[in-house]
Amino acid sequence: MASILDEYENSLSRSAVLQPGCPSVGIPHSGYVNAQLEKEVPIFTKQRIDFTPSERITSLVVSSNQLCMSLGKDTLLRIDLGKANEPNHVELGRKDDAKVHKMFLDHTGSHLLIALSSTEVLYVNRNGQKVRPLARWKGQLVESVGWNKALGTESSTGPILVGTAQGHIFEAELSASEGGLFGPAPDLYFRPLYVLNEEGGPAPVCSLEAERGPDGRSFVIATTRQRLFQFIGRAAEGAEAQGFSGLFAAYTDHPPPFREFPSNLGYSELAFYTPKLRSAPRAFAWMMGDGVLYGALDCGRPDSLLSEERVWEYPEGVGPGASPPLAIVLTQFHFLLLLADRVEAVCTLTGQVVLRDHFLEKFGPLKHMVKDSSTGQLWAYTERAVFRYHVQREARDVWRTYLDMNRFDLAKEYCRERPDCLDTVLAREADFCFRQRRYLESARCYALTQSYFEEIALKFLEARQEEALAEFLQRKLASLKPAERTQATLLTTWLTELYLSRLGALQGDPEALTLYRETKECFRTFLSSPRHKEWLFASRASIHELLASHGDTEHMVYFAVIMQDYERVVAYHCQHEAYEEALAVLARHRDPQLFYKFSPILIRHIPRQLVDAWIEMGSRLDARQLIPALVNYSQGGEVQQVSQAIRYMEFCVNVLGETEQAIHNYLLSLYARGRPDSLLAYLEQAGASPHRVHYDLKYALRLCAEHGHHRACVHVYKVLELYEEAVDLALQVDVDLAKQCADLPEEDEELRKKLWLKIARHVVQEEEDVQTAMACLASCPLLKIEDVLPFFPDFVTIDHFKEAICSSLKAYNHHIQELQREMEEATASAQRIRRDLQELRGRYGTVEPQDKCATCDFPLLNRPFYLFLCGHMFHADCLLQAVRPGLPAYKQARLEELQRKLGAAPPPAKGSARAKEAEGGAATAGPSREQLKADLDELVAAECVYCGELMIRSIDRPFIDPQRYEEEQLSWL
């Protein structure tokens, strides 16, 4: 058989697509140009399947991409549309004349029911090849099946509903399990539930649909030729109650609610629209004699599942007396009617025919039309051909329909991704609201459009709707981009003017107090809105001018605070002499620059509070920039003025640890003028090191001298290390102070002696106090009695110096005795050294014949060797080789030089006479051989190479010379 459903050909007949009449909108409000660059694809596109059946097609069903068609009376063709080139033929095995009446395929595409005209029903499962008759169903001509979408699976249908031509509704359940020869039958049970009646008695059950709502309620809609019945109820709990028995039992005593229409086609058909597989259906369409009953399905309603119902009459030429419709399918916004020679699509929103698709006569009359809910594709067939409809972008023009119906919310929903259409909808909605005098809503819509700003603003001005105009301006402002600064400035200024004008008009009216407060709150909300902050900040100058022109000082301050323009706020308070409020603003916002600017004003009026604020600011303030304000304030010299300045400067120095010289100098000047008792304490606390004090020493000296603070001057002299000046000035104040100064140059004994002589001269010549002069001798060991005697007058008797002279003589005698003792100790030490040298000359060591070199492990006596006191023995050449790497470069050079000279020196001559002659000749020529050997020994054998310092220094030396590391590494490869 040829490949099926994988190749398509273009439709042999052209579909007539009828565009619904739409009012011309002319030039759009926004200026958008809907430039359609590509040809619009039709919503419904028909394609003929490249398939020629071997026999007449009697029935066709599609679900979940599974297609089943009956050919002739005994063949079933099954096709998985995902594998269209692998069709499956199943023989029904019927030898009688029974024909296929209808076929039913569940939502999973797994369970197929074949109703025969002989009142028999066959069951075929997707995963099996066996056709199984349903014995319990025999005798019933099945017209409809209501599948159980909630409980149905590939292996079981769950409880389902079956409608017959006799008006009976049965409940059944099918299982795909074959179970062998003696296994259970596929029809687990088949029991009657209800009988549908019309006026003449039982009527065929044309359609059955069963659904379960989100709240657990069950809904069943059943149709006959003229009636549509609804069964609504909640299923009982338990496994047995999963079926529909309880639902239908509730209508035993009274009939269910139904809709009835008088005209009769002889049949009817019900179609549901379900957005997604296994989701709740959204809409229904019932094809009956009077037309198509269309509406929404609302599972939340207690008494009826149907809502928003309306009957669409059949298009012209369609109906019971003309060309009756054979089938109906429902999409999101259309229902399609199948006639014998054509398909007509009707918009469910307007009732207009949007498609009239005629079929060629060569294919024969159309039989039926079905929809695959899983893919949304529509299938129609004749006895000799199969056609498929693709539905593409069905909602593309729905927005225009809703727009014409003034259902703007739905119109916006369906054109949200099309800016040009959305702008048109918004403009129409804004115009509609404006005509309805809903000005605020109109302003909100206009703000979202691209309509001309000037026209809209003028429109509201002419209508004197300032509130709506403000709403429009605010929303336009919020939609501006950062680069649109000019527009933002215009809008913010205009809005401010509108608010101020409205506040001014309402302020004097006591009856409009509530409105005034509301407007005031709206204005403040506008000024403080984070969305507008950037634009308001850019326009703050013009807004301040507007506020000033209206005299609205309250909002001027409020706006300045919002814009963080605290300088303007503080200046306003200062101008109105509200200094404490100005300081409160400064303290709250902690801006150092504002403190620097306004401190000169505030310190004249609230000095204590301002200093408290400075202290609260701590290190955030630079005290140097506050000195000018303090200087101007403290020039009056009043105690309170100076004390506040001192309080802040002390805080800077003692708490903040300021080291800036200007601060310390100013504090010194304050102390010198207003608090001299703290001056000396400050100087002493600062220390006596000239490099560690933070004030200017020369300035401090001049300042203290000007104000006559001599003790402070003495301290500064000491810091400057001008000890003579310090002693001279201290002698004018206090001799004890001078003594303290004289002891300061500890390392310069000559200067100390000189200073003490100044003190002694002053005591002797100025105070004429001999006892105090003698006390000076005791205080300074550098002074002798002979140094002080010249200061005394001639008439002074020796009795005053007797003790001092005796003490001096005793000191000299003690010094002489110390010198003699040191000389004796030096002589004894020299004698001990001579004795040790004599003992060292006689020391020796014993070498045994079997002793070996500590380095090469060869017999020691074979070559010249060295013997160390530690016991280690080395050949001379081995020791030389071991010592050389550890010597510094200059010693290595010296070693090579000694070796070269020793090699060039003549060997020692035999005999004493010849030896003496050789020594004499060598002495004249250069160092002797013995001298060279001695130098070499001193260089090489000064200490044992294993026990000496050389071994200790070698502990961090690498085992392999870095210069030979690569060579050594390669040798191991």
UniProtKB/Swiss-Prot annotation:
Residues 903-929 are annotated as: Disordered. Changing A913S: In a colorectal cancer sample; somatic mutation. The keyword Translocase does not apply. GO terms for molecular function: actin binding; protein-macromolecule adaptor activity; syntaxin binding; ubiquitin protein ligase activity; zinc ion binding. CHCR repeats lie at residues 618-772. The modification N6-acetyllysine is found at K362. Ubiquitous. Expression was highest in heart and low in lung. Keywords: Acetylation, Autophagy, Coiled coil, Cytoplasmic vesicle, Endosome, Lysosome, Membrane, Metal-binding, Phosphoprotein, Protein transport, Transport, Zinc, Zinc-finger. Residues 454-481, 802-848 form a coiled coil. SUPFAM superfamilies: RING/U-box (SSF57850). One of its GO terms (cellular component) is CORVET complex. The modification N-acetylalanine is found at A2. It is found in: Late endosome membrane; Lysosome membrane; Early endosome; Cytoplasmic vesicle, Autophagosome. It holds the Pfam family Pep3_Vps18. A zinc finger (RING-type) spans 853-947. Plays a role in vesicle-mediated protein trafficking to lysosomal compartments including the endocytic membrane transport and autophagic pathways. Believed to act as a core component of the putative HOPS and CORVET endosomal tethering complexes which are proposed to be involved in the Rab5-to-Rab7 endosome conversion probably implicating MON1A/B, and via binding SNAREs and SNARE complexes to mediate tethering and docking events during SNARE-mediated membrane fusion. Belongs to the VPS18 family. Core component of at least two putative endosomal tethering complexes, the homotypic fusion and vacuole protein sorting (HOPS) complex and the class C core vacuole/endosome tethering (CORVET) complex. Their common core is composed of the class C Vps proteins VPS11, VPS16, VPS18 and VPS33A, which in HOPS further associates with VPS39 and VPS41 and in CORVET with VPS8 and TGFBRAP1. Interacts with RAB5C. Interacts with HOOK1. Interacts with STX7, MON1B. Associates with adaptor protein complex 3 (AP-3) and clathrin:AP-3 complexes. Interacts with SYNPO2. Interacts with PLEKHM1. This is Vacuolar protein sorting-associated protein 18 homolog. The gene is VPS18.
